[in-house]
Design a protein with these regions (language model features):
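Conserved catalytic-core segment of clan PA serine endopeptidases
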Residues: 2-22, 36, 62-123
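Catalytic histidine site
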Residues: 10-70, 171-177, 189, 211
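Loop/turn elements at helix/coil->beta-strand transitions in domains of secreted/extracellular proteins
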Residues: 13, 39-41, 138-141, 182-183, ...
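Solvent-exposed loop/turn segments at secondary-structure junctions
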Residues: 24-25, 39-41, 49-52, 70-73, ...
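Chymotrypsin/trypsin-fold serine protease catalytic domain
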Residues: 96-100, 106-186
């Protein structure tokens, strides 16, 4: 199966930025990924890129996905979130083993004239969608795709957050202090945290198709060797409970907002 490619032909448009307003009433963003489903309308991201964990429980404001984002461009339009499914354990007690979300978005829109929005169709029809793997042994390697922007602990800024970055690394079981999770997974990756949260971990990914299987989502980063540079991403393990959340979201239709 051939997936669509970004205008520059080098990065998969299934990845993009998720923009929202936080409890501080300021704009923020994460990374999100279009996933294949019946209604072709789902974005996968970290749970805390959907639910406000800094204030009383509730969804973040003005949530929108921009697939294929690059240096301010919106090549495939804007996809506004309509509804989402998260695990009750993350919503209720902030269990980061369940820090994932599947968001149903309306059809994409573009501004065709001042104050006029034009419907450009369903998300996965326009950019394709990644598959999903769960209940699998740890993959030997995964490709991590995201928009890192923040600093390393030493203050260096290796990324701008304006273009999609890709790293390939080995996965491993890990323990993370300060993060309420019992069985997080690590991947060797130099991504910094800010902006890369929500990044996709893809198995069997090929550059030619831009497609693979989603098998992890970055919820944190870690400096495992203490050199003041992040060298690992952290994800929940994708098990049957994650698949149940995905299945619930996959059955929800959205339609047009234009």
């Amino acid at each position: 199966m051939e997936g669509p490619v970004s205008p520059d032909g080098s990065t998969p448009p299934t990845s993009g930025k998720v923009f929202f307003i936080g409890s501080d009433l300021q704009p923020h963003w994460c990374t999100g990924t279009a996933v294949q489903t019946r209604y072709r309308n789902i974005v996968a991201t970290a749970g805390h890129c959907l639910l406000d964990t800094e204030a009383p429980a509730g969804p973040l404001f003005k949530w929108v996905f921009v697939p294929g984002y690059s240096e301010g461009t919106t090549p495939f339009g804007l996809y506004v979130g309509k509804q989402a499914v998260v695990h009750y354990a993350f919503d209720d007690v902030r269990d980061h083993d369940r820090d994932y979300a599947f968001v149903n978005v309306y059809n994409g829109v573009v501004s065709s004239a001042p104050d006029v929005l034009t419907n450009v169709g369903r998300l996965a029809d326009n950019v394709g969608g990644q598959g999903l793997e769960f209940n699998q042994p740890l993959a030997p390697t995964v490709d991590v795709l995201g928009y890192p922007a923040g600093p390393n602990p030493d203050g260096s800024l290796p990324y701008t957050g304006e273009t999609l970055e890709r790293s390939t690394g080995s996965t491993f079981a890990m323990k993370v202090t300060g993060l309420p999770a019992d069985r997080p997974i690590g991947v060797d990756s130099p991504f910094t945290g800010e902006g890369s949260l929500g990044s996709s971990w893809l198995t069997h990914y090929t550059s030619d198709s831009g497609l693979g299987y989603l098998n992890g989502i970055t919820i944190s980063v870690s400096d495992t060797d203490g050199d003041d540079r992040y060298d690992a991403g952290v994800s929940p393990y994708f098990d049957g409970e994650l698949y149940a959340i995905y299945r619930s979201a996959a059955g929800l239709w959205t339609g047009s907002i234009a």
